[in-house]
């Protein structure tokens, strides 16, 4: 009997949408559930555990409290929820057309964070960080950005809460993605390529390495130096730190509810990983189930082979920035002086990783894999041509891994359920796609 595959596809649910009143009202803090605590950050002056008060010159007090908190859940303020409602809850899609193209028995689901105004998951934490700084009287925020997703998200958030915003954008991405700068400027952000002549450290790097592509470590140093130099200014970070990962857990909480609607639970959960926030955002809710003995989903971090901190780095204390101004964090690191190649996934060019993600990987609760950018773009193009969404190069790392998991399921004849985070769209990355189509990607 002839099987009409197309008809069967459209009989099944493709997108799973939650009502606004089903949006999570609190963030999940995995620190409360870990078998042992993560190692504390160290003061760069003494190399002893840092006193929280020592962080107050650069961070809002509430964000420091969240960074150190052992509370299992932290309520989301109503003012933040009001802004979240512009795009949350975000949709969960079943990738029917990709499944068909792969001829796999696996079911592939993806959470799409590109529906946020800034086009990525970064807005989940930028809104929170800008809000808490505004409440404490901060007038100006500084930050770094790699590919520009975080800088865009913070510029948007500062616009909402009437704050000035200075963004130090890694030089290679500043010139690769000029329209990201335009978007940040549209929302009131002041964007400069890093290293820049605006800071002492930037001038030092430019003198020593005038042709450097820059790095997130350098950009962080510049943003921290700027914040310390101005009394009305605080620094914000788009990934790595505990409170940033905390704010992203709305992603996984929504995923759980959405999968429950179709009576599914993932066998594997996948996220790209630079600093670790989007991976933590989608993965920690499922790690919680694993720690409680309820389920045993694998959680996989996917990083670029050009910057393989989890797969080839050392698990030790290291500075978060190049100038050694930040606290030292226990994490997987390639070394804070490391300058990665100028790959097109600029948001993943970070030498270290979240202490939370690092600990989970070290203890076998997460896995990590790496891919070269050519095979990542192969997957991105296949996804765009089947599912229609143009993915960001960073997010495409998760797609590559999801496709490989689906092909393995095909080989083994397994009906595996695969979930990945499509953390952002690639509308500002078309020059990178042009490089791919012209055969210029290394």
From Swiss-Prot:
Q: What does this protein do?
A: The beta subunit is responsible for the synthesis of L-tryptophan from indole and L-serine.
Pfam families on file: PALP (PF00291)
Supply the HAMAP family for this chain.
Answer: Trp_synth_beta
> What subunit structure does UniProt give?
Tetramer of two alpha and two beta chains.
Please give the name of this protein.
Tryptophan synthase beta chain 2
Keyword set for this entry?
Answer: Amino-acid biosynthesis, Aromatic amino acid biosynthesis, Lyase, Pyridoxal phosphate, Tryptophan biosynthesis
| Enzyme superclass (EC) | lyase
Gene3D superfamilies from the UniProt entry: 3.40.50.1100
For this chain, one GO molecular function annotation is: pyridoxal phosphate binding
Q: Which cofactors are named for this entry? A: pyridoxal 5'-phosphate
| Record field: transmembrane | none
- So what does this thing catalyse? (1S,2R)-1-C-(indol-3-yl)glycerol 3-phosphate + L-serine = D-glyceraldehyde 3-phosphate + L-tryptophan + H2O
User: Does the keyword rRNA processing feature in the UniProt annotation?
Assistant: no
- Domain of life where this protein originates: Archaea
Q: Which of the residues bear the PTM N6-(pyridoxal phosphate)lysine?
A: 122
Does this entry carry the keyword Transmembrane helix?
A: no
Q: Which InterPro entries match?
A: Trp_synth_b-like (IPR006316), Trp_synth_b_CS (IPR006653), Trp_synth_beta (IPR006654), Trp_synth_beta/beta-like (IPR023026), TrpB-like_PALP (IPR001926), TrpB-like_PALP_sf (IPR036052)
Where does it sit, as one GO cellular component term? cytoplasm
Pathway info: Amino-acid biosynthesis; L-tryptophan biosynthesis; L-tryptophan from chorismate: step 5/5
Q: Name the PANTHER family for this protein.
A: TRYPTOPHAN SYNTHASE (PTHR48077:SF6), TRYPTOPHAN SYNTHASE-RELATED (PTHR48077)
Give the Enzyme Commission number: 4.2.1.20
Homology family: Belongs to the TrpB family.
């Amino acid at each position: 009997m002839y099987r009409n595959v197309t008809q069967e596809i459209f009989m099944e649910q493709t997108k799973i949408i939650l009502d606004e009143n089903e949006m999570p009202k609190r963030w999940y803090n995995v620190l409360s559930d870990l078998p042992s605590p993560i190692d504390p950050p160290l003061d760069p002056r003494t190399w002893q555990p840092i006193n929280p008060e020592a962080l107050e010159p650069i961070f809002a007090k509430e964000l420091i409290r969240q960074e150190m908190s052992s509370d299992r859940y932290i309520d989301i303020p109503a003012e933040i929820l009001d802004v979240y409602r512009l795009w949350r809850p975000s949709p969960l899609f079943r990738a029917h057309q990709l499944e068909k193209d792969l001829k796999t028995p696996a079911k592939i689901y993806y959470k799409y964070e590109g529906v946020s105004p800034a086009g990525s998951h970064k807005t989940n934490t930028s809104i929170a960080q800008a809000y808490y700084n505004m409440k404490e009287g901060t007038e100006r925020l500084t930050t770094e950005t790699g590919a520009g997703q975080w800088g865009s998200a913070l510029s948007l958030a500062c616009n909402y809460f009437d704050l000035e915003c200075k963004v130090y954008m890694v030089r290679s991405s500043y010139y690769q993605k000029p329209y990201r700068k335009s978007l940040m400027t549209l929302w009131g952000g002041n964007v400069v390529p890093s290293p820049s002549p605006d800071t002492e450290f930037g001038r030092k790097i430019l003198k020593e390495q005038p042709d450097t592509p820059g790095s997130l470590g350098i950009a962080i140093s510049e943003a921290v130096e700027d914040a310390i130099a101005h009394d009305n200014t605080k620094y914000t970070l788009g990934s790595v730190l505990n409170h940033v990962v905390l704010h992203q857990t709305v992603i996984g909480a929504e995923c759980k509810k959405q999968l429950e609607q179709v009576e599914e639970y993932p066998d594997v959960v996948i996220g790209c990983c630079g600093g670790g926030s989007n991976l933590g955002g989608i993965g920690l809710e499922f790690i919680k189930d694993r720690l409680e003995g309820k389920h045993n989903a694998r959680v996989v971090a996917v990083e670029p082979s050009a910057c393989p901190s989890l797969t080839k780095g050392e698990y030790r204390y290291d500075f978060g920035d190049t100038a050694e101004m930040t606290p030292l964090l226990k994490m997987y690191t390639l070394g804070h002086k490391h300058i990665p190649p100028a790959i097109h996934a600029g948001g993943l060019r970070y030498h270290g990783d979240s202490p939370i993600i690092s600990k989970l990987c070290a203890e076998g609760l997460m896995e990590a894999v790496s891919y070269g950018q050519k095979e990542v773009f192969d997957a991105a193009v296949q996804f765009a041509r089947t599912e229609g969404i143009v993915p960001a190069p960073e997010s495409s790392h998760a797609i590559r891994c999801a496709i490989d998991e689906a092909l393995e399921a095909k080989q083994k004849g397994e009906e595996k359920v695969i979930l990945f985070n499509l953390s952002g769209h690639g509308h500002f990355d078309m020059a990178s796609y042009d490089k791919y189509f012209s055969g210029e990607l290394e």
